[in-house]
Amino acid sequence: MRIRHFATTAVAVGALAALSAVPAQATEYSSALKIKGIQYDAPGRDSNSCSTGNTDEEYLTIKNYSSSTTVNLKGYVVRDASSTNKFVFTANHYLQPGDYVKLRGGHGTDSDSGNVVYRDNCNFMWNNDKDTIKLYKPSGAGADLHSYTKSGSDPDGNGYITYHG
């Protein structure tokens, strides 16, 4: 009985040691598409003017991290923390494995070859101090989610944060 108790204790201690050696990880969604980075604070003074503003300098980079599957962005949704700012990819836009797209503010011509989609809206989507970026699959399931604060997530203060390399 004493040997059995010792063996059980040794196994439990070993399991705890193994668990403590694993680094803490954020919960990851099962999705090939991930938020690669965000230019949440456009360079210069913010201006929502469609003709002279800088909303096209605010962008979100979404990347297909699959090594074998092409993903169509049609139906994917991007939201901010309050969900008042929302963009739905309404057209077919295919991301080959390893490819990316920049979702920009303002107006322009969407281009698969240029890796850009415009929101056709001159309002800024992301807050300059803090916000949450939510990416949803067409089914409504989460694809990726990140929160940031200017002081905690952007130490060099350039308004750009990288999430997935």
Task: Label each region the model flagged.
Residues 2-11, 22-74, 124-128, 151-152, ...:
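A structural motif detector for short, solvent-exposed N-terminal "entry" segments of globular domains
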Residues 15:
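Conserved structured catalytic cores and adjacent interaction surfaces
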Residues 27-34, 45-47, 86, 91-165:
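Solvent-exposed beta-edge/loop recognition patches
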Residues 39, 66, 75-77, 82, ...:
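A mature extracytoplasmic/lumenal domain signature
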Residues 51-53, 78-84, 110-111:
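Extracellular beta-rich ligand/substrate-recognition surface
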Residues 61, 77, 132-134:
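Residue-level detector of beta-strand face positions
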Residues 71-95:
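The feature marks short-to-medium sequence segments in extracytoplasmic or secretory-pathway proteins
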